[in-house]
Regions:
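Extracytoplasmic copper-binding redox domains, predominantly the cupredoxin/blue-copper superfamily
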Residues: 2-8, 18, 22-119
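Gram-negative bacterial Sec-dependent N-terminal signal peptides
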Residues: 12-14
Length: 119
């Protein structure tokens, strides 16, 4: 009888875990991409949530960097290289290519409630 009770308890715990992880509030952080091509970042402006990771992918034939002064800085990215950054605070993060400063973009990071403070 004791074994049957512990099996039922384990089953109930597994069922509860499955139900909780299926709830909308249990969503995981998103993986988002910005393409670098033809001397542009695309999309040029991206809105994400706190905890999301943005990955920049260089699809251009020449090296580029991703720089947000005081926040993040990639190494020179050759063709097909990637750089990822996880945003842990809300705000607007302006960035540019350190090799080609006319290339600019921004990431707007919102809290779960949708607000973004200026960085």
């Amino acid at each position: 009888m004791k074994v049957l009770g512990s099996v039922r308890g384990a089953f109930a715990a597994a069922l509860l875990l499955a139900l909780v992880s299926a709830l909308p509030g249990a969503a995981r952080a998103a993986q988002l991409e910005v393409k670098i091509d033809n001397f542009t970042f695309g999309p040029q402006k991206l809105t994400v949530k706190v905890g999301d990771t943005v990955t920049w992918i260089n699809e251009d034939d020449i090296p580029h960097t991703v720089v947000s002064t005081g926040h993040f800085r990639s190494k020179a990215l050759d063709t097909d290289d990637k750089y990822a950054f996880t945003f842990t605070t809300a705000g607007t993060f302006e960035y540019f290519c350190g090799l080609h400063p006319h290339m600019q973009g921004s990431i707007v990071v919102e809290t779960a409630t949708g607000s973004a403070a200026t960085q």
